[in-house]
A protein has these predicted regions:
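Alpha-helical membrane insertion/targeting regions
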Residues: 2-161
Length: 161
């Protein structure tokens, strides 16, 4: 059965969000920034697309599901970020800040080394706080994408999972 334009739009939203999320884990600030922009623009596009559908349609349900997923993820991410600010070992960053305050100008390599050391020092904390959120995000996107690809009714998109 050929897919409608609306189905293709929803599939594109899921694909863009999954792709943007993956891009945010690649080791390049430029790619991560581009991924963040794609994620944000797709989020806005989801609101716009949802406004074009009646509340009773599957397409409206998919858009609402995507929006709810992103808002729940954002809330969990913010809580995790607040916890990590208080619980993280900031010694690598503090050393660079102290050097700057004494008049030293750290090289780009020294700055990068401090950021990498900060990541190494806090890897377990970051995994505990953020990995469940990322798994939740991918699970929800994969579930929604699977439902539309199999042409199932969007009634299965209710709830937190």
């Amino acid at each position: 059965m050929p897919r409608s334009k609306n189905d293709k739009n929803i599939i594109s939203l899921y694909a863009l969000l999954i792709g943007a999320t993956i891009m945010n884990f690649l080791p390049s600030i430029a790619i991560q920034t581009f991924g963040g922009i794609i994620f944000f623009v797709t989020f806005i596009a989801t609101y716009i697309l949802r406004a074009k559908h009646d509340v009773e349609t599957d397409h409206y349900a998919h858009c609402s599901y995507i929006i709810k997923t992103i808002w729940i993820f954002s809330l969990l991410f913010t809580v995790g970020l607040i916890i990590s600010i208080g619980a993280a070992d900031h010694s690598a960053i503090i050393n660079i800040v102290d050097a700057i305050q004494t008049g030293a100008i750290p090289t780009e390599q020294q700055m990068m080394d401090a950021v990498l050391q900060f990541g190494k020092d806090n890897l377990i904390l970051f995994l505990i706080l953020f990995l469940p959120m990322v798994i939740y995000l991918f699970y929800r996107f994969a579930k929604g994408l699977n439902i539309i690809l199999k042409s199932k009714p969007a009634i299965a998109l209710k709830g937190w999972l």
